[in-house]
Amino acid sequence: MTKSLTSRKRIRKDFGRIPTVAPMPNLIEVQKSSYDQFLQIGVPVDKRTDSGLQEVFKSVFPIRDFSGKGELEFVAYELEEPKYDTDECQQRGMTFAAPLKVTLRLLVWDVDEETGARSIRDIKEQDVYMGDMPLMTSNGTFIINGTERVIVSQMHRSPGVFFDHDKGKTHSSGKFLFAARVIPYRGSWLDFEFDAKDMVYVRIDRRRKLPVTTLLYALEGAAATALREARTAEGRSVDPSEIAGMTSEEILDFFYQKLSYKRDDKGWKVDFKPDHLRGVKLMFDLVDAATGEVKIEAGTKVTPRAARKLAEDGMTEMRVFTEELVGRYAAEDMINEASGEIYAEAGEELTEAMLADMEKAGFTELRVLHIDHVNVGPYVRNTLAMDKNTTREEALIDIYRVMRPGEPPTLETADALFKGLFFDSERYDLSAVGRVKMNARLGFTMQEAPDTMRVLRKEDVLHIIRQLVELKDGKGEIDDIDHLGNRRVRSVGELMENQYRVGLLRMERAIRERMSSVDIDTVMPHDLINAKPAAAAVREFFGSSQLSQFMDQTNPLSEITHKRRLSALGPGGLTRERAGFEVRDVHPTHYGRICPIETPEGPNIGLINSLATFARVNQYGFIESPYRKVVEGTVTDEVTYMSAMEEGKYVIAQANAALTEDGHFADDLISCRKASDFEMVQPQDIDYIDVSPKQLVSVAAALIPFLENDDANRALMGSNMQRQAVPLVKAEAPYVGTGMEAAVARDSGATIAAKRAGVVQQVDATRIVIRATEDLKIAESGVDIYRLQKFQRSNQSTCINQRPLVKVGDLVGRGEILADGPLTEMGELALGRNVLVAFMPWNGYNFEDSILISERIVSDDVFTSIHIEEFEVMARDTKLGQEEITRDIPNVGEEALKNLDEAGIVYIGAEVQAGDILVGKVTPKGESPMTPEEKLLRAIFGEKASDVRDTSLRIPPGVTGTVVEVRVFNRRGVEKDERALAIERQEIESLAKDRDDERAILEGSFARRLKELLIGQKVVGGPRGMATGGVISEDLLSGYTAAQWRQIAVENDETATEIEGLKKAYEESIAKIQERFENKVEKLQRGDELPPGVLKMVKVFVAVKRKLQPGDKMAGRHGNKGVISKINPIEDMPYLEDGTYVDIVLNPLGVPSRMNVGQILETHLGWACRGLGAQIGALLEQVKRGLIPINDLREKLDDVYGPRHAKEDLAPMGDDQIKELAFNLRSGVPIATPVFDGARESDIVDMLRKAGLDSSGQVTLSDGRTGEPFDRKVTVGYIYMLKLHHLVDDKIHARSIGPYSLVTQQPLGGKAQFGGQRFGEMEVWALEAYGAAYTLQEMLTVKSDDVSGRTKVYEAIVKGDDTFEAGIPESFNVLVKEMRSLGLDVELGQSSF
């Protein structure tokens, strides 16, 4: 693999032994592909598949009016260009969306009243605007009202049929009651269940249960199907009263086999079938009908082996006594055809009297149901006997009464309701997934029931009941609802599709009513459509759905993890309270699909999961994982993606199974997975092998080195805490990584990657300009301008800042990293810093996971981060007049206004602290009665004296920082102030610079291509002074400007045509650039769309620098978290023998009980990386001085990296590249130790030896305070530490006076409300226990809700008096009011005690 520009500058030594065959899919593919399939933007209208938005429109349209005269058809839809780009939407607080235009066709029919025939009278087609459709950004997010949001994918139970039992919990006997449930994608649920008496019932939508035979009677029988076919052939319809349901005989015939008993002079005999006797205890002797011999005596239990032996011995029929037939069930009606007398009906139990009558009547053959009460139970037959309904009409009316209690049923309405429940595609939809799942469970083929058949069929119902009965008889298995074959993922596209369908259905009703109320001949489609319900449904989904979440933008990893999250919560999913242990637990099918580690701690554990690294979602919504095919014990490079259902059939080996050079398994027995179990299997029996060892964990877990050495609970904390790492001022990639860092940085969109190959023309801190060298389409610009984000605020108030990595003149390839983003370094994710750690106790300052850090960490800004706070103020139009943003604020001194410009807005770069004014604003006061003085002033000066109050935007407590950006928004038509105009001018200058640069590069490339075409051609015309007839040379052209070259005409027609095409393309490109510039300028100058009543809005962004301080939370990657207890002076820290002071001291007792040994291995390996880096740095210095040849440096690098890297990466490098690589390795050699395939203990020892360090990883440390060495050696090394988003500055808070609750008059709680500390019930008990009566009284009255008392106390304190009197607390008055509301009249009287 060729290394990119950035990865060549610093190569990560890889300890992985297993080669990666399949590339890891793009990490945000889940979001992007789903929404692309929903919108189908790039697909031509005629090639769109029936999915997503197209399917929604097709399923709702055509809409017909009630009379049948008008019909509104859907033709096509088109998404136009979005009005604003993503940056503009974020700045203006708008939604990034494209207008949706739908082409509709209105058909008007003429209806012949006599015959009912219809003919088309008129067709009108029109484009109708149907609201805006939010678009996904290139990073897989949505911008809704200016904020970035993510739609989380939802896990839900797949549609289909599921068989289960109650685990013996329902009935006191502990008997298993089996049930089957048909879950459609939308429509009514159908449940089949047994009760304690073994009767089979059916429930529709969890209503009252009905005997299952009622449902079967309601289904069409064979006779009705034949009648329907005959009528259809004649072109006539069938009346519901003519349709006959299934008969008792048909029902019994489907569920039971028939046995035919024949009568001869010796009695009854029947065919001998070994299967029918399996496990049966004989009531009578088993007699061979042919010989009369007793084969097995009565009372014996027949084993399958004995029954099989009898058949092998030639027994074909057995003799049956008449007594044995008593209690059997007739398989069909037994009728005397001569007299018409009925002896037994189908399903009726045979008695001795019946048999005697039949014998008299001369019956020689008797057909009975094969029910032996052992292998086959009489459940359906008993239900049939118990059912009061016997015909289809009775069954339909019974179903109608259950579904619509209280309404009078008729056969027509009952028939329509029943058909609408399960057999009407508009109301019932199994979905393609549901049909595929049902076919697989019931054994149907795709030919019998294709996935377009989305309603239930009679065969489905019958087979479900049959399988349920077989389960009861002990055949088959119940379903595991937590198996990933029974749970599927609904991604953005599908969630959006469902929501849009809801909106369109609301719209449909309105359209239908409007079609009936207007003159259909004169209206256009536009007049019938009101798109508000559809637009409202979309807005509601993105704005308030549980699955539409404010994106976690703390760092690139948290973004990517949020987009890959799978939630079992949300509409149509589970709730926290109802979810049991089984749903939350790790299931064997999670392997390679859902990460078993990354899930939140707390009530959501196991309900919110993360997709595994290599997993992808297939067209049916099931998660697939990749495997390499194994053919006859040889591992191939063919990769197959399989869902959990498909995987169950195969034997799959682990990725770390030992292989030989030629791909054979090295061992005779291999540990493999088969259908959720582990087995030892021979190589030739293996079907597949895992693609990579990291395919079973999520992205965050795959970033933890030595994950295999950490306890699962700590790994969970480690993967969760990496998402909380704050972007630091200087990012540093870890010495000990896993190789996933570059993939996360690339796919998260934090870095900037080149869209196409080219040459870097210009670079500064805000943009990179590249002249493209590939994909040069004639009509397109050959220039790519990448704007870098500078100090932008993220959703979590962290800082987004990008820095260029390339230089002018660099050749870059497609996909190469051009700029680093927040928490990335050289294109790799860099969540924290490598610091020198010692594991030892230090004066109790690392007790209970506390962390002791060196002052160097603070002074060198190692863990300093920048946070950007946003403050916003609006000037509104109030009833009393307009608010004004101004510098002229009443009763405010000049000192407080020093940072404001003449418009009253703070300067960029001003250093501000709590209480400072950011934007001056005044609000009109209501008219108040004037004092004589004011009257005098009014009379003299003729103006109001200060009738405004100060409502300026001030900095809240606890914030100190620098103003980095100001944005001013003006309503259209409102005059812009000087500050707004200055910002606008600056923006326009920046756009003009982009335009001019793009033009210049375009002109250069045009001139070059024109020159190539002109040289060697014969001149036939040109600018003044150019002789015709001569041949064009480079010297000739150098005498003219590039603009004059365009006037040259050449003799060769072909070249002339080519030159004309080139000129045309150039002019079009220049025009496009100018048009784009003018559009953007026009948008800037136009004014903004502000909320109603707002005239002006100002946003001020303040950057706050947060240094590390005691109380901040830090963590490693192994769940080793702690709070900083003390920042120690450097000279007091323990130091190494060479005088190096350690940066951080951790408690060694935090390791054994937590079992996260990975941190110790990381420390040792980091120590070796640092040592090797120092050696390489020393050699580089010698090379630069000319003391040693560069080959010595090459040899050292070859030794460090090993033969594989030396051959692939180092050998092709030139001397300058080797020097640059060595320069970047001075601080430490980065290594990758992939999860489950990382560095072994021997590798760590080897690295330590190469670095010239003690292989134990321990050194003698000395105490910085005394200079004495510590008693024993200490583990020292480099560990990667993160600073988490739990900063003490955000949490510390104090209040003296502040806001109070309206009802109780007690202080509010929480920092956001500037509240107080709650003195709770238990604290009151403590004061009571100590007998501190006065303190207690103070707490319960004047410090809480004694309104008059607290005012008096304040006054007393101001006067210097320290006595006070407590009054009645307000909460007592609330209690009295509460009691009065209960009807208890409580009055307070003065007592004379």
Swiss-Prot record:
UniProt cross-references to PANTHER family, sorted A to Z: DNA-DIRECTED RNA POLYMERASE I SUBUNIT 2 (PTHR20856)
Pfam families per record: RNA_pol_Rpb2_1 (PF04563), RNA_pol_Rpb2_2 (PF04561), RNA_pol_Rpb2_3 (PF04565), RNA_pol_Rpb2_45 (PF10385), RNA_pol_Rpb2_6 (PF00562), RNA_pol_Rpb2_7 (PF04560)
Domain of life where this protein originates: Bacteria
Function, in words: DNA-dependent RNA polymerase catalyzes the transcription of DNA into RNA using the four ribonucleoside triphosphates as substrates.
GO aspect biological process, one term: DNA-templated transcription
The enzyme's E.C. designation: 2.7.7.6
Class of the enzyme per the UniProt entry, highest EC level: transferase
Family of the protein in this entry: Belongs to the RNA polymerase beta chain family.
Gene3D superfamilies linked to this entry: 2.40.50.100, 2.40.50.150, 3.90.1100.10, DNA-directed RNA polymerase, beta subunit, external 1 domain (2.30.150.10), DNA-directed RNA polymerase, subunit 2, domain 6 (2.40.270.10), RNA polymerase alpha subunit dimerisation domain (3.90.1800.10), RNA polymerase Rpb2, domain 2 (3.90.1110.10)
UniProt entry tagged with the keyword Cell cycle: no
Protein name: DNA-directed RNA polymerase subunit beta
Gene for this chain: rpoB
Keywords of the record: DNA-directed RNA polymerase, Nucleotidyltransferase, Transcription, Transferase
GO CC terms of this entry: DNA-directed RNA polymerase complex
NCBIfam families tied to this protein: PRK00405.1, rpoB
Subunit structure: The RNAP catalytic core consists of 2 alpha, 1 beta, 1 beta' and 1 omega subunit. When a sigma factor is associated with the core the holoenzyme is formed, which can initiate transcription.
Species name: Rhodospirillum rubrum (strain ATCC 11170 / ATH 1.1.1 / DSM 467 / LMG 4362 / NCIMB 8255 / S1)
